[in-house]
UniProtKB/Swiss-Prot annotation:
One Gene Ontology CC term in the entry: cytoplasm
One Pfam family this sequence matches: HSP33
Family: Belongs to the HSP33 family.
Keywords assigned: Chaperone, Cytoplasm, Disulfide bond, Redox-active center, Zinc
InterPro entries: Heat_shock_Hsp33 (IPR000397), Heat_shock_Hsp33_C (IPR016154), Heat_shock_Hsp33_N (IPR016153), Hsp33_helix_hairpin_bin_dom_sf (IPR023212)
Keyword hit for Isomerase: no
Name under which the protein is recorded: 33 kDa chaperonin
Subcellular localization: Cytoplasm
Source organism per UniProt: Photobacterium profundum (strain SS9)
Lineage, uppermost ranks: Bacteria, Pseudomonadati, Pseudomonadota, Gammaproteobacteria, Vibrionales
Gene: hslO
Length: 292
């Protein structure tokens, strides 16, 4: 199992749907951007898996952002993904982060914020308190409150064969499945038996067979998941041009350059006085060309 993929599946004769996501490279790139403490890496991995699972529920082109905000050691942890399963994320923390604490120990008094932004249409934002002791329990509460659909979410992170891995599953009763709670609970019990090493090391087909070999499962083609930051030197140059030139020149006079750092991938873009002069010269030329 080497690729980062999201899988969707259905159960024949039962109005329950499932998702399985298995991530390696995507997770590794996100946690490599900073020297995150182990508990923060774990939290980002769970958020990453959760965002991938939630993004798969979008029925339109757009993006979804899942973030945790609080007054604890980790003030912010956020993952952004889109309908193409392109992911990026970052976290901010202060001091020592508890290794074996609950989500309340890590985030403190806080909220789970889910923002859905369609390419066309209005943005939607849902804010819920942190329920239970884990991120998964808070997400299950979100679905119970916002969609009134019984949902079970499993989020796992860890190391497998020397590499950081993140994986998870979502099980949800379909809108027309009300009254089939018994079937859902049966499948829920089966899903909860999944082991970390199975999620991290087996192909999706093998994971599903081990869990549901007595059920009829329809597995759909996978969708690849990847890290995608979106930053570039060109975007950084545009940002510099939007700042008063005298302020930029003062920074260069003090530090020899102006630097823009991308929190998502860790890349720094440096501009010296010659670069800045060229940027403004090109901007002025473009303005003249538009006038004529």
């Amino acid at each position: 199992m080497t690729n980062d993929n999201l899988y969707r599946y259905l159960f024949e004769g039962v109005s329950v749907r499932g998702e399985l996501v298995q991530l390696g490279n995507t997770y590794q790139q996100i946690i490599a951007s900073k020297e995150y403490p182990a508990p923060v890496q774990k939290l980002l991995g769970e958020l990453l898996v959760a965002t991938s699972l939630l993004t798969a529920t979008l029925k339109f082109e757009g993006s979804i952002t899942v973030q945790l905000q609080g007054d604890g050691p980790v003030r912010l942890a956020v993952i952004n993904g889109d309908h193409e399963q392109k992911m990026r994320g970052v976290a901010r923390w202060e001091g020592e982060v508890p290794t074996d604490g609950t989500i309340h120990d890590v985030i403190g008094k806080g909220h789970l914020v889910i923002t859905i932004t369609p390419t066309k249409g209005d943005r939607y934002q849902g804010v819920v308190g942190l329920e239970g002791d884990t991120l998964a329990e808070s997400l299950e509460g979100y679905f119970a409150n916002s969609e009134q659909l019984k949902t079970r979410i499993i989020l796992r992170t860890g190391e497998f064969e020397g590499n950081a891995k993140a994986a998870g599953m979502l099980l949800q009763i379909l809108p027309d499945g009300q009254g089939q709670e018994g079937d859902f609970e049966h499948l829920e019990q089966l899903t909860e038996t999944v082991k970390d090493e199975e999620l991290f090391g087996l192909d999706a087909q093998d994971v599903l067979y081990r869990l549901y070999h007595q059920e009829e499962v329809k597995l759909f083609d996978p969708q690849s998941v990847e890290f995608h930051c979106g930053c570039s030197r060109e975007r950084s140059a545009s940002a510099i041009c939007s700042i008063e030139r005298i302020e930029v020149e003062k920074i260069i006079a003090d530090e020899g350059k102006v630097s823009l750092h991308c929190d998502y991938c860790g890349t720094s873009y440096d501009f010296d006085s010659i670069d800045v002069a060229a940027l403004h010269e090109n901007a002025a030329k473009n303005d003249r060309d538009q006038v004529h």
